[in-house]
């Protein structure tokens, strides 16, 4: 980007090995079949401008199903079901790459929820300053996953957002 560094990556790897295992259980959520399609959700939101709708309605590689609390709920958590919309083969690295891509969909809006804001809010500027991700096992993005996103804090024109991705 004009000779300036805009991306820095630190990665570490491990060979699969046996050992102790546990994880935080997936929250009790509505299944994807009961959630609204992403485009239906944003089309029904009177706060989304035509320009923002056109941007958000662009073609994506994923089928998305949303559950967003009402704008006046001051919620700090929302979730989105997703799966790849077209076959991508069996290469586990391709599946991980698509999961990494999906991890950036919707996360920033978590800090907007408690304030009743959305991407159409005039004067709002939003970008990721850093992003960390851990892959604990092989996955297939042609299965349903749910991305549970929340924001613990916002202030000083910054917000902290976090997400956990669970297999259905």
Feature names for model-found ranges:
Residues 2-168:
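Terminal targeting signals and extreme-terminal segments of soluble enzymes
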